[in-house]
């Protein structure tokens, strides 16, 4: 269990569950998933029980006396699924609107997808030339990886973000459609040429988070990873000064 928790911040071969959440949005998605799975397991158990009874007693006439017409049974198998759907729908809609809401961001980062790399722009900060701070992020080739770096996930210039800060991500593309997806942050947003999509995030713990382009964008589609380093506000400001 401890090993599983340690590895859940990054994609793992044959991974069977979500990566560890680092934002309220992702925490809500995981909770919704667990609730929906509870109702699905209940329904699966009920249907399996009914099928077993039908197959086990298929030679007896008595069990089928009220099977083809029974007002109580019809009411039960209509009311209970309807209640389950409502109990799944309300939390789902609340989470959907919460994820779309951009709440007074303290800073904005623009991510632009290109074949086959990402370009990040920190709109709230200027460099020494008085221009908006921006840089490009390329995947590190396999033959240049250092010990501890991840194949097809590590990049030469990661995005750096402060924790406990409301951030707005503005996503677009310059050539074809891409997709900015960061599982641990609960972010998955299309990067469309000529269109500026936005989402928000509040990273609650320091760490390194990985994502990958999730829209088929060409031959090197699998070579467009994203890497976010979440640091304290002081470390973030020190990093800004170094750029």
Swiss-Prot record:
One of its GO terms (molecular function) is cytochrome-c oxidase activity. SUPFAM superfamilies: Cupredoxins, Cytochrome c oxidase subunit II-like, transmembrane region. Its cofactor is Cu cation. Cu cation A1 binds at residues 178, 213, 217, 224. The chain crosses the membrane at residues 36-55, 75-99. Residues 56-74 are mitochondrial matrix. Mg(2+) binds at residue 215. It comes from the Eukaryota. Its main location: mitochondrion. It is a multi-pass membrane protein. One of its GO terms (biological process) is ATP synthesis coupled electron transport. Binds a dinuclear copper A center per subunit. Residues 1-35, 100-243 are mitochondrial intermembrane. One of its GO terms (cellular component) is mitochondrial inner membrane. Cu cation A2 binds at residues 213, 215, 217, 221. Its EC number is 7.1.1.9. It is found in: Mitochondrion inner membrane. Keywords: Copper, Electron transport, Magnesium, Membrane, Metal-binding, Mitochondrion, Mitochondrion inner membrane, Respiratory chain, Translocase, Transmembrane, Transmembrane helix, Transport. It catalyses: 4 Fe(II)-[cytochrome c] + O2 + 8 H(+)(in) = 4 Fe(III)-[cytochrome c] + 2 H2O + 4 H(+)(out). Belongs to the cytochrome c oxidase subunit 2 family. Component of the cytochrome c oxidase (complex IV, CIV), a multisubunit enzyme composed of a catalytic core of 3 subunits and several supernumerary subunits. The complex exists as a monomer or a dimer and forms supercomplexes (SCs) in the inner mitochondrial membrane with ubiquinol-cytochrome c oxidoreductase (cytochrome b-c1 complex, complex III, CIII). Component of the cytochrome c oxidase, the last enzyme in the mitochondrial electron transport chain which drives oxidative phosphorylation. The respiratory chain contains 3 multisubunit complexes succinate dehydrogenase (complex II, CII), ubiquinol-cytochrome c oxidoreductase (cytochrome b-c1 complex, complex III, CIII) and cytochrome c oxidase (complex IV, CIV), that cooperate to transfer electrons derived from NADH and succinate to molecular oxygen, creating an electrochemical gradient over the inner membrane that drives transmembrane transport and the ATP synthase. This is Cytochrome c oxidase subunit 2. It comes from Brettanomyces anomalus.
